[in-house]
From Swiss-Prot:
Gene3D superfamilies: Cysteine-tRNA ligase, C-terminal anti-codon recognition domain, HUPs. This is Cysteine--tRNA ligase. Zn(2+) binds at residues 33, 211, 236, 240. InterPro entries: Cys-tRNA-ligase, Cys-tRNA-synt_Ia_DALR, Cys-tRNA/MSH_ligase, Rossmann-like_a/b/a_fold, tRNA-synt_1_cat_dom, tRNAsynth_Ia_anticodon-bd. Binds 1 zinc ion per subunit. It comes from Mycobacterium avium (strain 104). One of its GO terms (molecular function) is ATP binding. It is found in: Cytoplasm. It comes from the Bacteria. Belongs to the class-I aminoacyl-tRNA synthetase family. The lineage of its organism: Bacteria, Bacillati, Actinomycetota, Actinomycetes, Mycobacteriales.
């Protein structure tokens, strides 16, 4: 598809659906806030990856060349605290869970980003940005830290709608702040923590500064789309805009935010203890089925997890899969065709995946009727269209990704990467006689459906009866 029909996307900054017009004709630049690699990925994390992978695939189908950047936050308070509690180097902890996230994305066939920068690899760019903000009077030093002066930027709140009097950064009280509404750009060095030299002393970057510097480095001072979870609208994305604009640059022209995965009406999060880890989910369903489920709701809506909803999604996916296999057996090879006009209309309407999937299942129903009546040409036509549509959604059952790999083996391989990272943490805790941490890790794995057995050859785990 190269005629590029009109695409409309909901822009959080505008609070409305807008026509999408890229900065450069034929090219789209996207920045997605990636993971803070502090622990195992759960389906709430991966939903964001799947949602914006569909956006990327649709833009490619429309004929755009897409630059897609997804960062890795590998230096953060949570990473430092968890690594210290486990007696591990912070960088090793971050690298371990970065691999776990990569395995989870790969298991669900989320396309690799054009670049995946780590925060620690871009300290120079962050320091340069902060220097510009200080020079322009938008930032100041205090007790070894550097803060952004919120009152110096009158447009603060334009993304989130927050009134300046209602701003709470969630950073706690800091003695170096002139105003508690200000936010941290740079944290002064503390004993035992990593630090880098700067003109105002050693320290490490604040979270909000990291993404601005990396977005500028890979996409320039102005780019098309910034994506992330709706929980990032404030303060993270609001603070990104303030820094970039105050420094004299543009920033993202469209802001897209996905809804949460919820359980019992509450956001899925580690702090609430209601997460469903990827290993547990891959025990219950195949990777393609999990991807179908996570991508089936509108990206801006909440996805309330339930076993019934998951099994309904599996049943729907299997119905499509079985139809395509029937056509291939009775008619012959099924090459991808073109999406239906109604499917294209749905995705052009702010990525309305539920309406797009309704078109997939309508085509399946018509194809089954054609096949049953002996209309092989009609059945093949519907099957080819379905392959195109499901391919854009990233879960075409006949794609070589799912066809040439035994899915249970692929899932098990992904689980193995994730579980062994946790077992490595547990062994180090045992070596240090940190029995409480070792038990905590074992219990966490048990909650994910994984049983650990200590043997003379080291810990072994079982998943659904299969030993590793």
């Amino acid at each position: 598809m190269t005629d590029r029909p009109r695409l409309r996307l909901h822009d959080t900054a505008a609070g409305a659906v807008r026509d999408f017009v890229p900065l450069r004709d034929g090219h789209v630049s996207i920045y997605l806030c990636g993971a803070t690699v502090q622990g195992l990925p759960h389906i709430g994390h991966v939903r964001s990856g799947v949602a914006f992978d569909i956006l990327r695939r649709w833009l490619i189908a429309l004929g755009y060349d897409v630059a897609f950047i997804r960062n890795v936050t590998d230096i953060d308070d949570k990473i430092l605290n968890k690594a210290a509690a486990a007696g591990r180097p912070w960088w090793e902890w971050a690298a371990t869970y970065e691999r776990a996230f990569s395995a989870a994305y790969d298991a669900l066939d989320v396309l690799p980003p054009s670049a995946e920068p780590r925060a620690t690899g871009h300290i120079t760019q962050m320091v340069e940005l902060i220097e510009r903000l200080i020079e322009k009077g938008h930032a100041y030093t205090g007790d070894g830290d550097v803060y952004f002066d919120v009152l110096s930027y009158p447009e603060y709140g334009q993304l989130s709608g927050h009134r300046i009097d209602d701003v709470h950064q969630g950073e706690g009280v800091a003695s170096g702040k002139r105003d508690q509404r200000d936010f941290t750009l740079w944290k002064g060095a503390k004993p035992g923590e990593p630090s880098w030299p700067t003109p105002w002393g050693r320290g490490r970057p604040g979270w909000h500064t990291e993404c601005v510097a990396m977005a500028h480095e890979y996409l320039g001072p102005e780019f098309d789309i910034h994506c992330g979870g709706m929980d990032l609208v404030f303060p993270h994305h609001e603070n990104e805009i303030a820094q970039s604009r105050a420094a004299g640059d543009g920033f993202a022209r469209y802001w897209l935010h996905n809804g949460w995965v919820t359980m019992g009406g509450e956001k899925m999060s580690k702090s609430l203890g209601n997460v469903l880890a990827i290993p547990a989910m891959l025990q219950r369903v195949r990777p393609a089925e999990l991807r179908y489920y996570l991508g089936s709701a509108h990206y801006r809506s909440m996805l309330e997890f339930s076993d019934t909803a998951l099994q309904d999604a599996v049943k729907a996916y299997v119905g499509v899969e079985e139809f395509l296999h029937r056509v291939r057996v009775r008619v012959g090879a099924v090459e991808p065709g073109e999406p239906t006009p109604r499917f294209a209309d749905a995705l052009n309407d702010d990525l309305a995946v539920p309406a797009a999937l309704a078109e997939v299942h309508q085509a399946r129903a018509e194809g089954n009727r054609a096949l049953d009546s002996g209309d092989h040409e009609g059945a093949l036509r519907q099957a080819r269209s379905i392959r195109a549509m499901m391919g854009i959604l990233g879960c075409d059952p006949l794609h070589e990704r799912w066809e040439t790999r035994d899915e249970s083996s692929a899932a098990l391989a992904a689980v193995d990467v994730l579980v062994r990272a946790e077992l490595q943490n547990r062994e180090k805790a045992r070596e240090q006689r940190n029995w409480a941490l070792a038990d905590e890790i074992r219990n966490r794995l048990k909650q994910a459906g994984i049983e650990v057995t200590d043997t003379a050859d080291g810990p072994q785990w079982t998943l659904g009866g299969d030993g590793k």
